[in-house]
């Protein structure tokens, strides 16, 4: 217990000293994660006016907020989460589990015949602190996100996902290479150096899996 207490104290100290936390508070952004996405969007020029962007596991809304800010008033931002999320201007929110057919049907009804240009996933499980538990949970969420993109992302579209480096992540990236013309691994500046997280970008969705 004492070591956990020290770890918690260290995390809190780092969190409140974090320049991206301070920036998020000053700029009214919902999470520091918005700045990870901002760097990735700019570096790879992922957004164009009028795009349709889907944000999986969107709560508390930092990524959706950043997409809407970056895209201006054009296009559509559709956020999905099993958790509640307070409303965001210019963001359509669907509350539910996208593994359930009823939720998927509602999502498809929201979109109509409009193709999805970009799928985002910053999903992560609640951490137990044990890699043997956390990594399989993370990879399961990543599989669900990839399957969602397989079904709903247009040919030529892009998929950006957070992964934890560890068991299963290399195999997952190989699967992405079968699905996308170009796959890139990124570690944005706002990502804590000690964190095992990386962001993997698939661009140019193939018409068929190789």
Swiss-Prot record:
InterPro entries named in the record: RNA_methyltr_RlmE, RNA_MeTrfase_FtsJ_dom, rRNA-MeTfrase_E, SAM-dependent_MTases_sf
A Gene Ontology term for the protein's cellular component: cytoplasm
Active-site residues (renumbered): 162
Main location: cytoplasm
Class in the EC hierarchy, top level: transferase
Keyword terms, alphabetized: Cytoplasm, Methyltransferase, rRNA processing, S-adenosyl-L-methionine, Transferase
Binding-site positions, S-adenosyl-L-methionine: 61, 63, 81, 97, 122
EC number(s) per entry: 2.1.1.166
Any GO molecular function: rRNA (uridine-2'-O-)-methyltransferase activity
Coiled-coil regions, chain positions: none
Reactions the enzyme catalyzes: uridine(2552) in 23S rRNA + S-adenosyl-L-methionine = 2'-O-methyluridine(2552) in 23S rRNA + S-adenosyl-L-homocysteine + H(+)
Gene Ontology biological process: RNA methylation
SUPFAM superfamilies: S-adenosyl-L-methionine-dependent methyltransferases
Domain of life assignment: Bacteria
Record's subcellular location: Cytoplasm
NCBIfam families xrefs: PRK11188.1
Role description: Specifically methylates the uridine in position 2552 of 23S rRNA at the 2'-O position of the ribose in the fully assembled 50S ribosomal subunit.
Family the UniProt entry places it in: Belongs to the class I-like SAM-binding methyltransferase superfamily. RNA methyltransferase RlmE family.
Protein name as annotated: Ribosomal RNA large subunit methyltransferase E
């Amino acid at each position: 217990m004492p070591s956990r207490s020290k770890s918690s104290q260290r995390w809190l100290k780092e969190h409140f000293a974090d320049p991206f936390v301070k920036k998020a508070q000053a700029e009214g952004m919902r999470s520091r994660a918005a700045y990870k996405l901002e760097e990735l969007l700019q570096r790879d020029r992922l957004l164009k006016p009028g795009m349709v962007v889907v944000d999986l596991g969107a709560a508390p809304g930092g990524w959706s907020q950043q997409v809407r800010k970056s895209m201006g008033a054009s296009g559509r931002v559709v956020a999905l989460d099993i958790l509640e999320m307070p409303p965001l201007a210019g963001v359509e929110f669907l509350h539910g589990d996208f593994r359930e057919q009823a939720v998927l049907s509602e999502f498809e009804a929201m979109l109509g015949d409009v193709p999805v240009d970009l799928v985002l996933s910053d999903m992560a499980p609640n951490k137990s602190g044990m890699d043997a538990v956390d990594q399989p949970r993370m990879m399961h969420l990543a599989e669900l996100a990839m399957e969602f993109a397989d079904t709903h992302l247009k040919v030529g579209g892009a998929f950006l996902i957070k992964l934890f480096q560890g068991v299963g992540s290399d195999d997952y990236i190989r699967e992405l290479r079968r699905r996308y013309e170009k796959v890139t691994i990124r570690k944005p500046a706002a990502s804590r150096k000690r964190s095992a997280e990386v962001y993997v970008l698939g661009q140019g969705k193939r018409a068929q899996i190789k």
